[in-house]
């Protein structure tokens, strides 16, 4: 058994760690609330944009935009959104597992894959995973702007425009609630048709003045908005996961301190008992 001094040092060390994890929990909770506000503000726009674009994909258009044409999936691109930092539980691991499983299916079907990573963790993982990483962005902070993502997204759009990609997906952790974050893979290109059951009829649009100019701008904005929403959702998921992880670490530290305190008390008791025995033995010898 370790002596009382060593145990006391361990207790102090765990208490210091507990203070750090408790502070990180409070910081994550504050950041999560702010991230939730940003997510709630941008989610209606992203969802309605996807719905409108889904109707466009079902419509009979005067001008057939390349983003509406379904091609054989010989090369597939993934825009993978992860965190820059760790200490957020299994958030990134679960996301990467989902991507790897989907990539395996694509490769079994004979397709090649290409990645665009947003977040330092995804860049580290996919650079070692195998497959081409065409673009990367990291260090966006807790409140990124759409302008911070445009350059990275454009790399994948240009690859699609040039026929180097036949499918494009965005992958991120969708914020469900504080305890639940779900990794999702959403198709960006070719444009997915609307899954809204309310609209069973065809949507026909009249574009003024020029359908090509309008669609060229609108469809690019759609892709950018979906990626931005994925980034915002992922940030909220990151802070929620970190808050939960730090709370668990703080609670575990408390339990460990309690266990160490019991060991310390036993060590102190043993030391005192030994001292008393030595005193009694010495007195008897005299």
UniProtKB/Swiss-Prot annotation:
It is found in: Cell inner membrane. PROSITE patterns: ATPASE_GAMMA (PS00153). GO terms for molecular function: ATP binding; proton-transporting ATP synthase activity, rotational mechanism. Keywords: ATP synthesis, Cell inner membrane, Cell membrane, CF(1), Hydrogen ion transport, Ion transport, Membrane, Transport. One of its GO terms (cellular component) is proton-transporting ATP synthase complex. The keyword Membrane applies. It is a peripheral membrane protein. SUPFAM superfamilies: ATP synthase (F1-ATPase), gamma subunit (SSF52943). It comes from Shewanella pealeana (strain ATCC 700345 / ANG-SQ1). This is ATP synthase gamma chain.
């Amino acid at each position: 058994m370790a002596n009382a001094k060593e145990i006391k040092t361990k207790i102090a060390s765990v208490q210091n760690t507990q203070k750090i994890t408790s502070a990180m929990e409070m910081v994550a909770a504050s950041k999560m609330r702010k991230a939730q506000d940003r997510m709630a503000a941008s989610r209606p726009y992203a969802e309605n944009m996807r719905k409108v674009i889904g109707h466009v994909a079902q419509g009979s258009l005067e001008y057939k935009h390349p983003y509406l044409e379904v091609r054989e999936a010989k090369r597939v691109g993934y825009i993978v959104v992860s965190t820059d930092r760790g200490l957020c539980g299994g958030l990134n691991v679960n996301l990467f597992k989902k991507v790897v499983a989907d990539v395996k299916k694509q490769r079994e079907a004979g397709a090649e894959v290409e990645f665009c990573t947003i977040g330092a963790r995804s860049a580290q993982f996919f650079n070692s995973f195998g497959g081409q990483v065409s673009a990367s962005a990291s260090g966006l902070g807790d409140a990124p702007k759409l302008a911070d993502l445009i350059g990275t997204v454009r790399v994948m759009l240009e690859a699609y425009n040039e026929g180097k990609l036949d499918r494009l997906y965005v992958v991120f952790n969708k914020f469900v609630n504080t305890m639940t974050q779900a990794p999702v893979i959403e198709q960006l290109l070719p444009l997915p048709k609307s899954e809204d059951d309310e609209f069973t009829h065809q949507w026909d649009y009249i574009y003024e003045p020029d359908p090509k100019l309008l669609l060229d701008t609108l469809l690019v904005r759609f892709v950018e908005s979906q990626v931005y929403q994925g980034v915002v959702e992922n940030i909220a998921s990151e802070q929620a996961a970190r808050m939960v992880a730090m709370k668990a670490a703080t609670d575990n530290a408390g339990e460990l301190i309690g266990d160490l305190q019991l060991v310390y008390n036993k060590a102190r008791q043993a030391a005192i008992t030994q001292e008393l025995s030595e005193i009694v033995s010495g007195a008897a010898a005299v």
